């Protein structure tokens, strides 16, 4: 494919609008050809950054009009399956924001439907795999330079969350990212999940018990703990420490200007994910567009990865009530090898 890839974005909320801007202004080889959004006001606002894009209220209408070569799904997770199905049936390449679907049962349906095609068509938007620091850490793991990987420690901290943020969202909206990137870093899937509760923050709203410590065991024996804290106040921080046989490595440390003033040491920290993972988002989209042009269609997490994450999230939600919860998964199909 030598022409510019015509991308239809499904969903014109904050994430969809961000992707529209990214594709039209920072991505080569693609442009927004269609905005699929039932809310007229949102669609009109998004269209300001996508001159010439056609407006549709349903993905089926955009497909019937031959308005798209590929689809980017940016609606909430509960609406993913109704968009994925017609897009797959039309044989379109898809980048689907996380999660693939909200549960393993529906994710498995998508996996089974996709296997009727000649190759994987779905890339799931777990953007951390495209972060330069995560890539450097994975290369270190794979090289064996520091010996075997023994343990991973993760920090996932948000300044605050709204009243609508529920207990289960600690897993399904936040730790969901660790359930993808940790197996990718360590080269082994999650086989069990446990949740521990430290002292509850007085800043957590009524009904929310946090922070939590999520403990994962991987199939290769690596143990992982992740601090999930959504009311840390000072900023947004995602960091990982890897413990090897011959040393350790850390990523996600504060960066930028360092200042010493009035007996204090000051350094900048991110305030949200849009700056912490700005490069990752850009690389994710560009890699996907390049893969579609090359005919490989997928350049990152695939639908099977999305299914495994759904299984891990279900175990994590159960673990909020106590116990070590197993994550049982069938072997990866050759289709996704």
Curated annotation (Swiss-Prot):
**Which residues are in coiled coils?**
none
Q: Which UniProt keywords apply?
A: NAD, Oxidoreductase
Q: Which domain of life is it from?
A: Bacteria
Enzyme Commission (EC) number: 1.1.1.18
NAD as a keyword of this entry, yes or no, is yes
Q: Which GO terms describe its biological process?
A: inositol catabolic process
Is this entry keyworded NAD? yes
Query: Per its UniProt record, what Pfam families does this chain match?
Result: GFO_IDH_MocA, GFO_IDH_MocA_C3
Q: Which SUPFAM superfamilies match?
A: Glyceraldehyde-3-phosphate dehydrogenase-like, C-terminal domain, NAD(P)-binding Rossmann-fold domains
Q: Which leading EC class covers this enzyme?
A: oxidoreductase
What reaction does this catalyse? myo-inositol + NAD(+) = scyllo-inosose + NADH + H(+)
What the protein does?
A: Involved in the oxidation of myo-inositol (MI) to 2-keto-myo-inositol (2KMI or 2-inosose).
Quaternary structure, from the entry: Homotetramer.
Record-stated family: Belongs to the Gfo/Idh/MocA family.
Q: Which PANTHER family match?
A: INOSITOL 2-DEHYDROGENASE, PTHR43593
The record's annotation in HAMAP family points to: IolG
Protein name, UniProt field: Inositol 2-dehydrogenase
> Which gene holds the coding sequence for this protein?
iolG
């Amino acid at each position: 494919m030598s022409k510019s890839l015509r991308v239809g974005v499904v969903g014109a909320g904050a994430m969809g609008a961000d992707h529209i801007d990214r594709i039209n202004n920072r991505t080569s080889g693609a442009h927004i050809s269609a905005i699929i959004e039932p809310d007229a006001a949102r669609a009109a606002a998004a269209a300001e950054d996508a001159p010439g894009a056609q407006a549709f209220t349903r993905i089926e209408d955009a497909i019937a009009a031959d308005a798209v070569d590929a689809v980017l799904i940016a609606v909430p997770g509960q609406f993913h399956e109704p968009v994925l199905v017609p897009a797959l049936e039309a044989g379109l390449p898809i980048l689907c924001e996380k999660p693939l679907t909200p549960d393993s049962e529906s994710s498995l349906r998508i996996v089974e439907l996709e296997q009727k095609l000649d190759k994987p068509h779905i890339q799931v938007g777990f953007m951390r795999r495209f972060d330069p620091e995560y890539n450097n850490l994975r290369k270190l793991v794979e090289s064996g330079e520091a010996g075997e990987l023994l343990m991973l420690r993760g920090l996932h901290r948000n300044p605050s969350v709204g009243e609508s943020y529920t207990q289960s969202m600690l897993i399904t909206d936040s730790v969901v990212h660790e359930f993808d990137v940790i197996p990718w870093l360590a080269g082994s899937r999650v086989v069990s999940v446990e949740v521990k509760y430290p002292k509850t923050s007085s800043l957590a709203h009524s009904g929310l018990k946090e922070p939590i410590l999520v403990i994962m065991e991987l199939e290769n024996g690596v143990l992982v703990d992740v601090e999930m804290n959504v009311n840390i106040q000072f900023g947004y921080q995602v960091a990982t420490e890897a413990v090897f046989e011959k040393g350790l490595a850390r990523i996600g440390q504060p960066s930028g200007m360092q200042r010493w003033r009035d007996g204090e040491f000051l350094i900048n920290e991110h305030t949200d994910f849009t700056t912490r993972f700005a490069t990752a988002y850009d690389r994710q989209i560009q890699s996907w567009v390049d893969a579609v042009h090359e005919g490989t269609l997928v350049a990152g997490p695939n639908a099977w990865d999305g299914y495994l994450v759904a299984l891990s999230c279900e175990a994590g939600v159960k673990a909020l009530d106590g116990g070590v919860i197993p994550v049982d998964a069938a072997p990866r199909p050759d289709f996704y090898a």
